[in-house]
């Protein structure tokens, strides 16, 4: 009886940890460091940088704190 309870608890914990979609929102890369996009660093170069560090893809978008500045963002590895 106790082993069944522990197996169910283990299953719930693993399913929560392995649920896809938890890291699909764009985040600055690396966290805390904003790479500005502009004439010298385009969306194509941002994508190349992000895929080189192991992320799925990258793109340039307005910065969260300063919307007038465009920053490089990467999608999570999931």
From Swiss-Prot:
Q: Which residues form the signal peptide?
A: 1-23
Keywords (alphabetical) are:
Antimicrobial, Disulfide bond, Fungicide, Plant defense, Secreted, Signal
List this protein's GO terms for biological process. Answer: defense response to fungus; killing of cells of another organism
Q: Which cysteines are joined by disulfide bonds?
A: 37-60, 46-72, 50-74
Tree of life domain: Eukaryota
The record's subcellular location field reads: Secreted
What Gene Ontology cellular-component terms does the record carry? Answer: extracellular region
The answer to whether UniProt assigns keyword Membrane to this entry is no
Q: Which family does it belong to?
A: Belongs to the DEFL family.
What protein does this entry describe?
Defensin-like protein 281
């Amino acid at each position: 009886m106790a082993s069944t309870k522990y197996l169910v608890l283990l299953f719930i914990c693993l399913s929560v940890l392995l649920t896809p979609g938890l890291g699909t929102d764009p985040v600055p890369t690396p966290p805390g460091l904003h790479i500005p996009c502009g004439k010298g660093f385009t969306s194509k170069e941002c994508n190349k940088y992000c895929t080189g560090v192991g992320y799925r893809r990258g793109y340039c978008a307005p910065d969260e704190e300063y919307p007038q500045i465009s920053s490089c963002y990467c999608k999570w590895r999931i």
